[in-house]
């Protein structure tokens, strides 16, 4: 990654703990391009090639759909939650690491994480364990320690009609 950045004349800064730095940017409501680890294939971002944003503001869904993803306004975004907290957010959840099932969002949390709750009160979450993806887990945990909500908005690192990015 460093060679590509230098080759393109881009300014960069190496950080010791990217999870901590990214969590702090999310708290400030920045959009974070999260690129780490192995490539991902398929239509779901699972924490290696992701666009991340805070789920705490409803308008973040519109910002991503219109200004970054260039897609329809009604398209929902998925929450990524650390597995230990899944029962705090979802009714009868299972350990779903691949965003394949929808669950009802606990009523008390619907207003706390509006950017990732579908119009019918459900969400299609990714439950993230430290064993499966340590850096992504640490990012979500760090966001939770700063905000009280152990969830981030996670969408694929691409724009409408394009594949997920594979390299920097």
Describe the role of every protein-language-model region.
Residues 1-168:
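Flexible beta->alpha loop and helix N-cap segments adjacent to enzyme active/binding sites
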């Amino acid at each position: 990654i460093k060679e590509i950045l230098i080759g393109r004349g881009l300014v960069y800064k190496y950080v010791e703990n990217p999870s901590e730095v990214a969590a702090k940017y999310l708290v400030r409501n920045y959009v974070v391009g999260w690129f780490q680890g192995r490539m991902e294939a398929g239509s779901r971002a699972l924490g290696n090639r992701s666009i991340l944003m805070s789920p705490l503001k409803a308008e973040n869904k519109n910002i991503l759909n219109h200004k970054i993803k260039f897609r329809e306004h009604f398209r929902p975004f998925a929450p990524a939650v650390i597995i230990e907290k899944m029962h705090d957010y979802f009714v009868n959840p299972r350990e779903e690491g691949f965003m394949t099932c929808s669950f009802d969002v606990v009523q008390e949390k619907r207003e706390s994480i509006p950017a990732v709750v579908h119009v019918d009160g459900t969400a299609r979450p990714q439950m993230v364990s430290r064993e499966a993806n340590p850096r992504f887990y640490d990012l979500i945990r760090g966001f939770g320690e700063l905000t009280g909500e152990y969830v981030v908005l996670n969408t694929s690192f691409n724009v409408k009609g394009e594949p997920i990015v594979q390299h920097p």
